[in-house]
Amino acid sequence: MAFRWGTENWNLCWHVRQTGRERYLALALLSGHFHVDLFSTDKDQRLENVHYRGYADYYRQMPLVFSQSRINLNISLKTILTGIPLRVIDVLGCGGFLISNYQEEMQEYLDIGKECVVYENIEDLFLKAQYYLTHEEERKSIALAGV
């Protein structure tokens, strides 16, 4: 299939770019105020305050990362219009505390605010991260309820 402007190919590219921008802005804002570890092989030199931890094996290391992190962040690809991202299930299944962007299906299967937390925009994400980092018992209670 050939690439043509104005087709689904272009829309997908745009959505991926938007997701990358949202992730960058979130990490830049959060790392300016909090200690942020990122498990990724892609290092963005602009994110000077982010602590890159490299690749984490999905089966052996990621469950430990999810369960031991004070906050796990999910920013879904904009191409995921419906459904619950696997990362949400992974984090909750490991007993981790999750802040995620809102996906409509989440409210069908999860008790938002009691099993996980969702944010509306980058500013809301920052405020919720700030709140839950200073409310340890509430954060732990939500993490346990999500299992």
Language-model regions: role of each:
Residues C116-I122, Y132-E136:
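Conserved acidic donor-binding segment of nucleotide-sugar-dependent glycosyltransferases
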Residues I122-L125, G146:
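Catalytic phosphate/metal-binding cores of nucleic-acid and nucleotide-processing enzymes, i.e., regions
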Residues A129-Q130, V147:
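Amphipathic alpha-helical segments within well-ordered protein domains
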Residues R60-Q61, D124-L127:
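Short acidic active-site motifs
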Residues D90-L92:
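Short alpha-helix at the nucleotide-sugar/activated-sugar donor binding site of glycosyltransferases
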Residues N101, Y119, K140:
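Mg2+-dependent phosphoryl-transfer enzymes with acidic/Ser/Thr/Gly-rich catalytic loops
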Residues E138-V147:
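A short, well-ordered alpha-helix in the C-terminal region of glycosyltransferases
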Residues M1-P85, F97-M106, I112:
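Nucleotide-sugar donor-binding catalytic core of glycosyltransferases
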